[in-house]
Amino acid sequence: MSWQTYVDEHLMCEIEGHHLTSAAIVGHDGATWAQSTAFPEFKPEEMAAIMKDFDEPGHLAPTGLILGGTKYMVIQGEPGAVIRGKKGSGGITVKKTGQSLIIGIYDEPMTPGQCNLVVERLGDYLLEQGM
């Protein structure tokens, strides 16, 4: 299965009638493996800051998580495994796997819990596969 198929069928899938706004799978080095059409263009330093928060949980708390120029307030995640952010009626979930970051961005009517479910389910599957 291609990485694009994972994005299209597993991240951008319908859940309770709703979809993520955008999603991507990005390598730990910041290289995009696959993304949805609406996924924001991000700067290398934004991805580096996200990776640093996985190594040093709490690193992003003072500044927020920034992706594609959009700033999200960091809310409780799972240190070293999941970063969650909120901005207005939407937000972001980032799940770290052995080789990649699974990123989902949502807005209402999708809920934070639905975004977490979609992103973390794929991330857990990839971890089980050694990826």
UniProtKB/Swiss-Prot annotation:
It is found in: Cytoplasm, Cytoskeleton. It comes from the Eukaryota. Signal peptide: none annotated. The modification Phosphothreonine is found at T111. GO terms for biological process: nuclear migration; phospholipase C-inhibiting G protein-coupled receptor signaling pathway; protein complex oligomerization; regulation of actin cytoskeleton organization. Phosphorylated by MAP kinases. Coiled coil: none annotated. One of its GO terms (molecular function) is actin monomer binding. It holds the Pfam family Profilin. InterPro entries: PFN, PFN_euk, PFN_sf, Profilin_CS. SMART domains: PROF. Pollen specific. Keywords: Actin-binding, Allergen, Cytoplasm, Cytoskeleton, Disulfide bond, Phosphoprotein. A motif (Involved in PIP2 interaction) lies at residues 81-97. Disulfide bonds join C13-C115. SUPFAM superfamilies: Profilin (actin-binding protein). GO terms for cellular component: cell cortex; cytoskeleton. Binds to actin and affects the structure of the cytoskeleton. At high concentrations, profilin prevents the polymerization of actin, whereas it enhances it at low concentrations. By binding to PIP2, it inhibits the formation of IP3 and DG. Multimer. Occurs in many kinds of cells as a complex with monomeric actin in a 1:1 ratio. Belongs to the profilin family. The variability of the residues taking part of IgE-binding epitopes might be responsible of the difference in cross-reactivity among olive pollen cultivars, and between distantly related pollen species, leading to a variable range of allergy reactions among atopic patients. PANTHER family: PROFILIN, PROFILIN LP04. This is Profilin-1. It comes from Zea mays (Maize). The gene is PRO1.
